[in-house]
Amino acid sequence: MLGGGWRSLGTALVALGAGALLRAGPAQLRAVFLHTEHEQRKSKTVAQANMKVEVLPALTDNYMYLLIDEETKEAAIVDPVQPQKVLDAVKKHGVKLTSVLTTHHHWDHAGGNEKLVKLETGLRVYGGDSRVGALTQKVSHLTSLKVGSLNVKCLCTPCHTSGHICYYVTKPNSSEPPAVFTGDTLFVAGCGKFFEGTPEEMYRALIEILGSLDPETRVYCGHEYTINNLKFARHVEPNNVSIQEKLAWAKAKYDSGEPTIPSTIAEEFTYNPFMRVREKTVQEHAGETDPIRTMGAIRKEKDNFRVPKD
């Protein structure tokens, strides 16, 4: 057991890269080690006629996403913390990787950028923060990018970090659902911690920006936090049937090693307490009548929430 663990640890450290390793703190190294215990997590392909998304588990509970334009076979990678795994997926799909879409600068999202650009030269690296490694173009709110024939709109959603970007992907003249890559702003049934922002900023990010997207938009978030998020959601709204049903579904998926990603914007409004801060049931739980104050109250509660085992 120990020997296998050390071998896996060595593999993990090689995957992370020496530069990122030197910058990593104890918590980061722990996550690199723990990801070896989660290697049974399965990848998943979400295929549409115009775009394909390969869901790539990384580290302990992270997700990377290979976005493929089916028309041109051009691809972008979202948050490539494990570069070799990314390149293996690129080879598997027979596509040309042209760009990196970085949601934010945290090491478990941007920590693989510098190694990836050395392994695959000529990549364009996008992000909304100068702290993003190997950055070639800093983007801002509503900056437009292209991945083959796909349109990518940058949505500035500061709060988790001040330079956080979500990437909204559409295909012109298509009736298929768009996709949005939300990093650590919006999770399934949750949201990111307010490390560099305020409840007002998260309200704007979730309700006014992401919440105004096409309801059928598929949400690809940065972490597999779904079960714990839904347990907190159940605590906030114990009589919400949508939460109960989603939790049972998520447990079954997790037990089989499958991702619970993607959700949709419409679904998030039914079970995500941070998307439901205008609902009376959530406000009553928080003891507030204002949605922004409710956002702050339930985030503070979530930060100290002890997740039940059931």
Swiss-Prot record:
Under catalytic activity, the entry for this protein gives: an S-(2-hydroxyacyl)glutathione + H2O = a 2-hydroxy carboxylate + glutathione + H(+); (R)-S-lactoylglutathione + H2O = (R)-lactate + glutathione + H(+)
Q: What cofactor does this one take?
A: Zn(2+)
* CDD domains xrefs: hydroxyacylglutathione_hydrolase_MBL-fold
The protein's superkingdom reads Eukaryota
Q: Name one GO cellular component term.
A: mitochondrial matrix
Would you identify the family this protein belongs to, as annotated? Belongs to the metallo-beta-lactamase superfamily. Glyoxalase II family.
Q: Which HAMAP family has this protein been placed in?
A: Glyoxalase_2
- What is the name of the protein in this document? Hydroxyacylglutathione hydrolase, mitochondrial
What gene name is given for the protein in this entry?
A: HAGH
